[in-house]
């Protein structure tokens, strides 16, 4: 599997252009430390119409951080591609934490699916962004394809579970 994943990452390295490099660095930076997504969730919390969406995002991010970043990364301790092949010139700083699952992809899909479950149009735009964010992590040679796949699946599942729990709580409050 690692050979196939490296082959794909090396193919992505062959696509580099100055414009695409800048775009991927910028897109990836929006996922750094979850700041963009935290800000978006807080903004959504400010308005009654989007408050539930913002709360779902925050709960999903918290759960994802605990499961993905604190538990799974340290359980699997998967080396990053840039650690295994340091000959590839990186456009970003070498990450210090483990690779699996991708935290950027995890938070991107948690938030995108949280929005999509409540607003299909806005959610579709956020899903497109989440896919770009996931792609940027492979393009930048800091994640394997299975890292971003796991982040996308886990983030989507977490968002769906949080959404279902919030709906169930809301139903019980109305009884």
Q: Model regions: which residues?
A:
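Interfacial segments of alpha-helical transmembrane regions
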Residues: 40-66
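Small-polar-interrupted transmembrane alpha-helices in polytopic inner-membrane proteins
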Residues: 59-73, 124-137
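Membrane-water interface at transmembrane helix exits
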Residues: 44, 68, 72-77, 116, ...
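Membrane-embedded catalytic cores of phosphoryl/pyrophosphoryl-handling enzymes
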Residues: 89-175
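Alpha-helical transmembrane segments in multi-pass membrane proteins
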Residues: 56, 60-65, 69, 151, ...
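N-terminal transmembrane-helix/juxtamembrane module of multi-pass inner/ER membrane proteins
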Residues: 1-35, 69-97, 173-175
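Membrane-helix interface segments
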Residues: 19-20, 34, 49-54, 118-125
